[in-house]
């Protein structure tokens, strides 16, 4: 039997009327079940997201709290390290020295001619220069070795150079006495020493003569001068630690201004040591008058040169019988040298620091600078190329003869005939100027 279109449509209508409600009910139940499952899943996702957000907020809160505590701890540690941490040389308040007016002296630039420069090869950091028997001698350390661990006395005639003797430590100064013996000031991390090398044993042995004063190790020895009577004068910059060498000790004294520098005299005849003058804020240079009767001492912190009778004992800088011969200097004086005509040469390690002297009465700020470390302290002091690196003055009438420029951190000065030789920090050359 064939089913026509009408019959087929009737069958579909009867089936839909019979099964349709059940199918619709089934689909409705299935859709409701699916909607409820989706709703439960959505609620679970929302609860999970809320839980994650809460945990994240709690973690961030704990992190912020820990960061705050850590930051406060770091800040407190920094405040302690810069303000309250005990230091060996607490700063002392002082009155900043006046600034001298222009002297009108002749301006002389250090020579740029290579013929006026004494090359020292690998040697660097010239700390002292002397002339003897037509040769120029320089105290320097070998740049090929660890800095300041081993120093040599180098002799040059302008064409060649050779090491005369070597010492362990920093050779901060040397001087020849009337007998030709060599007197040295040597600084090591263990302390300073005054040493002697006899003229017939150079290169063989260096004898330590003075290593202690009143049972305490000698401090930062900075200069030595031999008198015509055989007595030997030597300076101790101050009571600072000597672990990092003379330059670091001088910077520390500039910032602390403890006034603990001393000048001593050693008499080889009876091997006695006596105090000449104390209360110096960085005794960094010595010079004797041509007749050996007057002693000049450079005072770093007070920017002056003290003058006194070489036979005087137990003086105080600025006190009775020890007055400032030249004050208000434009820089912090270091090495001194005296010519036969009484002309005194004053070298400057650094130019005057306006920040330091502005805070002369502030022990807080200078204490922070002392605690901040050596790298920061080095940035506080410098010597621009246009600033005086040395000056020449007549000790007879006090007239300023010449101002030298073009150097950097002048550590040594030595007049020889028509030239003046200069040593500069970390320089591999002995510089000079024609006069």
Task: Give short role names for the model-derived ranges.
Residues 185-227, 234-251:
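Asp-box/WD-like beta-propeller blade repeats and closely related beta-sheet repeat scaffolds
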Residues 131-134, 176-179, 226-229, 290-292, ...:
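Residue-level detector of Asp-centered blade-edge/turn motifs that repeat once per structural unit
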Residues 93-125, 396-402:
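A short helix->beta-strand "capping" segment at the edge of beta-propeller domains
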Residues 115-151, 408-412:
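Beta-strand-rich domains and repeat architectures in extracellular enzymes and scaffolds
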Residues 138-139, 183-185, 233-235, 297-298, ...:
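Residue position within the beta-strands of beta-propeller blades
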Residues 142-143, 148-192, 210-213:
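Blade-loop segments of beta-propeller domains
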Residues 117-122, 163-168, 209-216, 275-281, ...:
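Surface loop/turn motifs at the tips and blade-to-blade linkers of beta-strand repeat domains
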Residues 92, 141-148, 234-258, 349-384:
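Short, conserved, GDST-rich strand-edge loop motifs in beta-rich repeat architectures
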């Amino acid at each position: 039997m064939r089913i026509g279109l009408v019959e087929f449509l009737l069958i579909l209508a009867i089936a839909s009327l019979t099964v349709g409600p059940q199918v619709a009910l089934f689909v409705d139940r299935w859709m409701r079940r699916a909607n409820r499952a989706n709703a439960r899943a959505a609620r679970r996702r929302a609860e999970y997201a809320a839980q994650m957000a809460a945990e994240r907020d709690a973690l961030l809160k704990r992190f912020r709290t820990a960061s705050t505590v850590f930051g406060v701890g770091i800040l407190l540690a920094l405040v302690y390290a810069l303000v309250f941490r005990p230091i060996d040389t607490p700063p002392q308040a002082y009155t900043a020295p006046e600034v001298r007016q222009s002297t009108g002296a002749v301006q002389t630039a250090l020579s740029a001619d290579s013929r006026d420069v004494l090359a020292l090869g690998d040697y660097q950091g010239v700390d002292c220069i002397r002339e003897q028997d037509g040769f120029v001698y320089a105290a320097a350390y070998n740049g090929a070795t660890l800095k300041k661990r081993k120093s040599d006395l180098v002799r040059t005639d302008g064409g060649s150079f050779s090491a005369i003797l070597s010492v362990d430590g920093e050779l901060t100064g040397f001087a020849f006495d009337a007998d030709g013996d060599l007197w040295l000031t040597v600084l090591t991390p263990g302390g300073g020493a005054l040493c002697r090398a006899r003229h017939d044993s150079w290169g063989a042995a260096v004898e330590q003569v003075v290593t202690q004063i009143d049972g305490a190790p000698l401090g930062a020895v900075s200069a030595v001068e031999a008198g015509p009577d055989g007595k030997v004068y030597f300076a101790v910059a101050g009571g600072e630690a000597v672990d990092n060498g003379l330059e670091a000790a001088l910077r520390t004294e500039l910032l602390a201004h403890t006034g603990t520098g001393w000048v001593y005299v050693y008499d080889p005849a009876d091997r006695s040591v006596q105090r000449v003058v104390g209360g110096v804020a960085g005794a960094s240079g010595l010079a004797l008058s041509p007749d050996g009767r007057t002693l000049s001492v450079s005072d770093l912190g007070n920017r002056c040169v003290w003058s006194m009778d070489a036979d005087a004992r137990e003086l105080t800088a600025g006190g009775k019988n020890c007055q400032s011969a030249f004050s208000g200097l434009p820089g912090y004086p270091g090495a001194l040298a005296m010519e036969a005509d009484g002309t005194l040469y004053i070298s400057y390690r650094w130019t005057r620091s306006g920040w330091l002297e502005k805070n002369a009465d502030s022990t807080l700020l200078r204490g922070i600078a002392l605690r901040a470390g050596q790298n920061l302290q080095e940035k506080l002091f410098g010597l621009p190329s246009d600033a005086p690196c040395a000056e020449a003055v007549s000790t007879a009438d006090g007239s300023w003869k010449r101002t030298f420029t073009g150097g950097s951190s002048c550590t040594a000065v030595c007049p020889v005939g028509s030239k003046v030789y200069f040593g500069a920090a970390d320089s591999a050359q002995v510089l000079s100027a024609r006069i």
